[in-house]
Curated annotation (Swiss-Prot):
GO biological process terms held by the UniProt record: cellular heat acclimation
Protein name: Uncharacterized protein C16E9.15
Lineage: Eukaryota, Fungi, Dikarya, Ascomycota, Taphrinomycotina
Signal peptide (UniProt feature, chain positions): none
Family: Belongs to the HSBP1 family.
Gene Ontology CC annotation, any one: nucleus
InterPro entries assigned: HS1-bd
An annotated Gene Ontology molecular function: transcription corepressor activity
């Protein structure tokens, strides 16, 4: 492995630049992860709300169906 790849103390500017770049990349990845986490949570909350609404409408439909009396013939 060459000295520049190992990042030895002969070139501290190179080591500092790599450290700075690595820190920046980690910050970017962390920020992206937080954004994705927020988006996922928002989508999950939206789906939960929609499922609650669907359950309620199904419950109402079942109640209406059970409250309608069957039509009987008088023949």
């Amino acid at each position: 492995m060459s000295a520049s790849v190992r990042g030895n103390s002969k070139n501290p500017q190179s080591t500092s630049a790599i450290t700075t770049l690595t820190d920046k990349l980690l910050e970017d990845i962390s920020g992206d992860f937080e954004t994705l986490q927020k988006q996922f949570s928002e989508k999950l909350e939206t789906m939960s709300t929609r499922l609650d609404q669907l359950e309620e409408s199904m419950r109402e439909a079942m109640n209406k169906k059970s409250s309608v009396s069957p039509v009987t013939s008088t023949e």
